[in-house]
């Protein structure tokens, strides 16, 4: 049979020595995908992430497997047959079953190499298990006929043949039983000890095996990707419509403002609608189906919310709720979060070398005060005390921030204190807009990981903003908003007249100003930065997702890496 090959995996012999040959009936329990047994034999953690937590990542091997599938269909190799067995507890799609001298031959196509053998090529244990499961389904569907398994390895142009014997039957039954047990558990299996498997696994960026091993002080190769090649699509012109045409998103501006543009869906990671932008139902459905987040902002830059497929299994959120109901867990995470935020502010102020003696004195005083707050964070007895420390740090930081601006900056763009809702000066108008983009970035990462934004560990519920989003966002205010904004103002990148709409009560970004702020933010996100703890470089966009995944590891794996990165 030729099943869609989603990635190359070797396999271990976990289920190949089982002796049971007669499965117990499965009543009222969902059956197991036959293809999932391949993942189970390769790595139990991989099976759990894909089948229980519903996390799947399409990498180059996935697309290569799909191309093989399409090629075989075009060549007439596929005759698809849907099979399911309540007795076996399995279901799957058989692509090719052929008759050879009275024997039903089940074919399995793999794009990679066969396993090394003695005198003849051998099938990998995970491939044997998968083919055996399909053979059992075929045997039940066509009783009486003998069944044989064949696995075709296209890279080496070899076919491995083996019978559906008692050992293989028992291995399939044992694997199904193990799969049911894992599916009923709330706990992820541990990271595999066979490290070579992680390098070839598409879910390594989700599993983070090398980061988990690093907690115990081991040196490991970097598996988390440096950047996401896809782009965020911002639509900010009022009256613009976003639709779908085949595999593309079509952006149609208002009449008289240009021709429609097309964006290949595979190259879009998120669609962001600013203000009065219409998104069709077809485009929304396409985005959800293809894991493209859709997010809405007001025209003034306030983040309203988002829609995304993400990972939908309840086990991940149950673990989150159980962990964050513990006051000690919340306090420990909050201590590290506030310390990381204060140290980020401190390090930004330390970068300043400009200014007269007064500026240097103000900056030095703020740095001393921020340093004095750091050890207090580690000893804070409650969240309320931490809030006070954070507030004291913010007062010293924002009091010193004007001294990071150059002397030749337009006075209308000078920072004279934090204000918002609505912003009353140009600097705060841009800063608030950037904070909204950071908030969106963080909430999108939280949804992608499968956590609940409404259940945090530090901030209390208020308004429509999810506490967990506000928690994680604290790590990124300085690097993704404060630093690029101050630098752009010092470069005189802003037009105090054309980029803003000023009234007696508030200041908003104009259309040109919004476009400039979006470009500033997206450019900053693409910049790479070397993580001081993990020791590898990645973009700021990937850093946001990494921090959320490291947060989840605080209660699902090896804790200790969340909120440990620091600015240089």
UniProtKB/Swiss-Prot annotation:
Protein residues bound to Mn(2+) 2: 390, 459, 474
Protein name: CRISPR-associated exonuclease Cas4/endonuclease Cas1 fusion
Self-association state and partner proteins as the record states: Homodimer, forms a heterotetramer with a Cas2 homodimer.
Organism of origin: Myxococcus xanthus (strain DK1622)
Enzyme type, top EC level: hydrolase
EC number: 3.1.-.-, 3.1.12.1
NCBIfam families assigned to the protein according to its UniProt record, in alphabetical order: cas1, cas1_MYXAN, cas4
Ranges where the record places region CRISPR-associated endonuclease Cas1: 232-568
Protein's UniProt keywords contain 4Fe-4S: yes
Induction statement: Part of an operon going from at least MXAN_7266 to MXAN_7259 that includes a CRISPR operon with transcription continuing into the pre-crRNA locus.
Residues involved in Mn(2+) 1 binding: 95, 108
GO aspect biological process, one term: defense response to virus
Record region (CRISPR-associated exonuclease Cas4): 1-209
Keywords from the named record: 4Fe-4S, Antiviral defense, DNA-binding, Endonuclease, Exonuclease, Hydrolase, Iron, Iron-sulfur, Magnesium, Manganese, Metal-binding, Nuclease
């Amino acid at each position: 049979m030729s099943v869609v090959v989603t990635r190359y995996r070797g396999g271990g012999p976990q289920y190949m020595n089982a002796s049971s040959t007669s499965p117990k009936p499965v009543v009222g329990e969902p059956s197991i995908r036959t293809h999932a047994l391949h993942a189970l034999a390769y790595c139990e953690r991989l099976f759990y992430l894909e089948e229980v937590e519903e996390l799947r990542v399409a990498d180059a091997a996935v697309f290569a497997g799909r191309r093989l599938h399409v090629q075989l269909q075009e060549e007439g190799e596929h005759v698809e047959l849907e099979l399911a067995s309540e007795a076996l507890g399995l279901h799957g799609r058989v692509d090719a079953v052929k008759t050879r001298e009275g024997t039903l031959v089940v074919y399995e196509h793999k794009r990679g190499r066969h396993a090394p053998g003695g005198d003849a090529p051998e099938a990998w244990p995970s491939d044997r298990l998968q083919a055996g499961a399909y053979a059992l389904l075929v045997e039940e569907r066509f009783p009486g006929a003998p069944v044989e398994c064949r696995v075709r390895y296209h890279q080496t142009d070899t076919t491995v043949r083996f019978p559906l014997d008692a050992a293989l039957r028992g291995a399939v039954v044992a694997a199904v039983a193990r799969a049911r047990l894992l599916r009923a558990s709330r706990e992820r299996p541990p990271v595999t000890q066979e490290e070579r498997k992680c390098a070839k696994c598409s879910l390594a960026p989700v599993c983070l095996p090398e980061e988990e091993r690093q907690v115990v002080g081991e040196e490991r190769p970097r598996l988390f990707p440096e950047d996401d090649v896809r782009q965020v699509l911002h639509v900010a012109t009022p009256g613009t419509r976003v639709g779908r045409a085949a595999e593309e998103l079509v952006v149609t501006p208002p009449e008289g403002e240009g021709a429609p543009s097309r964006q290949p869906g595979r190259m879009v990671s998120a669609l962001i609608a600013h203000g009065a932008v219409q998104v069709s139902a077809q485009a929304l459905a396409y985005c959800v189906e293809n894991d493209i987040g859709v997010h809405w902002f007001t025209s003034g830059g306030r983040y309203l919310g988002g829609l995304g497929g993400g990972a939908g299994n309840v086990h991940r959120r149950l673990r989150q709720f159980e962990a964050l109901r513990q006051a000690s867990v919340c306090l420990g995470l909050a201590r590290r979060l506030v310390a990381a935020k204060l140290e980020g502010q401190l390090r930004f102020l330390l970068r300043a070398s400009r200014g007269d003696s007064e500026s240097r004195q103000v900056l030095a005083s703020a740095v001393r005060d921020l340093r004095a707050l750091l050890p207090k964070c580690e000893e804070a007895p409650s969240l309320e005390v931490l809030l006070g420390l954070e507030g004291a740090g913010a007062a010293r930081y924002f009091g010193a921030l004007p001294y990071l601006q150059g002397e030749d900056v337009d006075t209308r763009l000078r920072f004279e204190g934090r204000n918002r809702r609505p912003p009353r000066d140009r600097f705060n108008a841009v800063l608030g807009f950037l904070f909204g983009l950071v908030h969106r970035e963080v909430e999108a990462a939280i949804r992608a990981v499968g956590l609940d934004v409404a259940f945090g560990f530090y901030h209390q519920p208020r308004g429509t903003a999810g506490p967990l989003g506000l928690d994680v966002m604290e790590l990124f205010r300085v690097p993704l908003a404060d630093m690029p904004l101050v630098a752009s103002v010092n470069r005189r990148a802003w037009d105090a007249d054309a980029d803003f709409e000023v009234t007696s009560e508030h200041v908003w970004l104009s259309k040109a100003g919004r476009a400039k702020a979006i470009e500033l933010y997206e450019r900053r996100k693409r910049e790479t930065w070397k993580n001081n703890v993990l020791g590898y470089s990645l973009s700021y966009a990937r850093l946001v997702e990494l921090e959320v995944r490291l947060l989840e590891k605080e209660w699902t794996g090896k804790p200790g890496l969340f909120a440990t990165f620091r600015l240089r």
